Amino acid sequence: MLTIADKTFSSRLFTGTGKYANSQVMATSIIASGSELVTMALKRVDIDNRDDDILAPLIKAGVNLLPNTSGAKNAKEAIFAAKLAREALGTNWLKLEIHPDPKYLMPDPIETLAAAAELVRQGFIVLPYCHADPVLCKRLEEVGCAAVMPLGAPIGSNKGLASRDFLEIIIDQARVPVIVDAGIGAPSHAAEAMEMGADAVLVNTAIAAAADPIAMGRAFKLAVESGRMAYEAGLAGTINHAIASSPLTAFLDQTA
């Protein structure tokens, strides 16, 4: 079980809502994945309309909603969007995203830290999307973020854990849950993140853009579960030379 702030989750796979062919495929894929926390961009939904094509199936599925501020270019815009979401959806949970560059969608660390501090002060449960920067993640933790969401690779790139070395440091020093977000393009990437000790992963493009999103949702579910199980079991260490799994000398002595 994973606890973040005031909620406990049995699934460590969080999902997004973008890039699906239609809302029915989205909802069915999310259900197949077992995800209990689903993020959605405020700019893509009519948050005042419970019958919205994206919002309605999520409410019906009974998942926890995590509105995000994707599209915000600075702290002021993100804080404004957060207040709208809280009023319309009745949740103080927020995935904080601030990326002023539309080409690479890199999170702005300065604006993110400033917005996070203010949103926490205003009572939000803040989960910030950020660079895999151990110093920044520690600062976000110190201002009161409920978790940190460092990127594995650029959003939608499917390149996996390009920032692995830094993710390992973040996981080692964090005192709040670490959710690897962005760049996870295959179930094996998700399993790798979980084996490292990440508390959860967030996946969107890899499921939504798959030939069979529903089957891919199930595949990610199993990958996250197996990766976490492997981490808890304790992975065998790596070495630079061979060690026989069966003693060879005893066999030779018996045949002499």
Curated annotation (Swiss-Prot):
Pathway: Cofactor biosynthesis; thiamine diphosphate biosynthesis. 1-deoxy-D-xylulose 5-phosphate binds at residues 156, 182-183, 204-205. GO terms for molecular function: thiazole synthase activity. It holds the Pfam family ThiG. It comes from the Bacteria. Its main location: cytoplasm. The keyword Protein biosynthesis does not apply. Gene3D superfamilies: Aldolase class I. It is found in: Cytoplasm. One of its GO terms (cellular component) is cytoplasm. The active site is at residue 95. It catalyses: [ThiS sulfur-carrier protein]-C-terminal-Gly-aminoethanethioate + 2-iminoacetate + 1-deoxy-D-xylulose 5-phosphate = [ThiS sulfur-carrier protein]-C-terminal Gly-Gly + 2-[(2R,5Z)-2-carboxy-4-methylthiazol-5(2H)-ylidene]ethyl phosphate + 2 H2O + H(+). Its EC number is 2.8.1.10. GO terms for biological process: thiamine diphosphate biosynthetic process. Homotetramer. Forms heterodimers with either ThiH or ThiS. This is Thiazole synthase. It comes from Photobacterium profundum (strain SS9). The lineage of its organism: Bacteria, Pseudomonadati, Pseudomonadota, Gammaproteobacteria, Vibrionales. The gene is thiG.
